[in-house]
């Protein structure tokens, strides 16, 4: 091997450093960069958005999901380099589905006016069910919003939960007939645009809904060995089992090429069965590590995941647990230690 002299090495050093920076950036994006945190604002004791964005930056949280186009938050995100998933709230779907002009106005007011905010996805609706009045408006609203943002390179999707999916083991996953009639045209649209499907994945609810048959360690990523065998795939955690059940359902519905982004997952610290700081800490930290490596059905590729949620929300409606999903208290102090690396 020919040895280079000192001067040639020094001359090549800037190029080597540049290449190294690309390698490190790529690694960082596939590991830390896959994790975001949902910023719900249903509380009367939350701090100003500028302080919240600063907290994201201090904690190295590089992605945020925001459930409505709150102008204070969008302004605070300017120049932050935090990648944003911005929701179109369900009550707006009918209006945006009925008129391209309305969709254009929504995008102008909430996206184009914030050129120095990094928009990752627009989620058109959250957990809309086939029986909901808004169900028929999801796809046309997605189409109108997509036309309005297509020149900006922003992907458009919608977020679903797993109520419309059944089957065990994961390879038997399928959409229920009612849900399939709703989701099939959405799948076709997403496939044509190479956009991901957003899925809210909550092992907590599966566990508390069937504590007789589902083990807590399987739910918290702490099972010492395989719990579910499914052909060539083995499952040691419920999160992956749910995720792969959705993938199997997509494959049966013509959406085998789609990628799933987990748009919500977390664990409450109070208000119901199996809640508490210890379980929440275990779940969230293990989730962050687990999603780096893909699932048994889709191995080798990190799963982009958004933890629910940044703060407790004392104005949230529904069961008491709905108020206690936060990683942080309203005073910006952590409830428990989370390693976002």
Curated annotation (Swiss-Prot):
Name the record gives this protein: Probable glucan endo-1,3-beta-glucosidase BG3
Signal peptide extent: 1-25
Principal subcellular localization: endoplasmic reticulum
Disulfide bonds: none
Top-level taxonomic group: Eukaryota
EC number: 3.2.1.39
Cellular localisation: Endoplasmic reticulum; Secreted
Glycosylation sites: 116
GO MF annotations in UniProt: cellulase activity; glucan endo-1,3-beta-D-glucosidase activity
Enzymatic reactions: Hydrolysis of (1->3)-beta-D-glucosidic linkages in (1->3)-beta-D-glucans
Glycoprotein as UniProt keyword: yes
Keyword field contains rRNA-binding: no
Alphabetized UniProt keyword annotations: Endoplasmic reticulum, Glycoprotein, Glycosidase, Hydrolase, Secreted, Signal
Induction line: By infection with a virulent strain of P.syringae pv. maculicola. Induced by infection with the biotrophic powdery mildew pathogens Golovinomyces cichoracearum and Blumeria graminis. Induced by infection with the turnip vein clearing virus (TVCV) and cucumber mosaic virus (CMV).
Active site: 127, 264
UniProt similarity note: Belongs to the glycosyl hydrolase 17 family.
Function noted in UniProt: May play a role in plant defense against pathogens.
A biological process from GO: response to bacterium
UniProt lineage: Eukaryota, Viridiplantae, Streptophyta, Embryophyta, Tracheophyta
EC primary class: hydrolase
GO cellular component: apoplast; endoplasmic reticulum; secretory vesicle
């Amino acid at each position: 091997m020919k040895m280079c002299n000192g001067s040639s090495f020094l001359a090549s050093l800037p190029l080597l450093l540049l290449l190294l920076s690309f390698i490190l950036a790529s690694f960082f994006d596939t590991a830390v960069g896959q994790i975001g945190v949902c910023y719900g604002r249903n509380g009367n004791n939350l701090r100003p958005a500028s302080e919240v964005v600063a907290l994201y930056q201090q904690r190295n949280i590089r992605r945020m999901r925001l459930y409505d186009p709150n102008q204070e938050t969008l302004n605070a995100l300017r120049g932050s380099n935090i990648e944003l998933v911005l929701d179109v709230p369900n009550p707006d779907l009918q209006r945006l589905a009925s008129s391209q002009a309305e969709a254009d106005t929504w995008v102008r007011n909430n996206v184009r006016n914030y050129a120095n905010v990094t928009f990752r996805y627009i989620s058109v609706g959250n957990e809309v069910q086939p029986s909901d009045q808004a169900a028929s408006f999801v796809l046309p609203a997605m189409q109108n919003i997509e036309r309005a943002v297509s020149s900006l390179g922003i992907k458009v999707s919608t977020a679903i939960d797993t109520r419309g999916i059944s089957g065990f083991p994961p390879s038997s996953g399928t959409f229920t007939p009612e849900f399939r009639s709703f989701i099939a045209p959405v799948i076709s649209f997403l496939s044509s645009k190479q956009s991901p499907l957003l899925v809210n994945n909550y092992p907590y609810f599966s566990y508390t809904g069937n504590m007789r048959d589902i083990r807590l360690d399987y739910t918290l990523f702490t099972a010492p060995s395989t719990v579910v065998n499914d052909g060539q795939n083995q499952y040691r955690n419920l999160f992956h089992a749910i995720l792969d059940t959705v993938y199997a359902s997509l494959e049966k519905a013509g959406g085998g090429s789609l990628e799933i982004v987990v748009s919500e997952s977390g664990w409450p610290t109070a208000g119901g069965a199996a809640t508490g700081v210890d379980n929440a800490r275990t779940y969230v930290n293990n989730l962050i590590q687990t999603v780096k490596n893909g699932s048994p059905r889709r191995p080798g590729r990190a799963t982009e995941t958004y933890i629910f949620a940044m703060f407790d929300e004392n104005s949230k409606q529904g069961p008491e647990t709905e108020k206690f999903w936060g990683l942080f208290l309203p005073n910006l102090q952590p409830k428990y230690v989370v390693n976002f690396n």
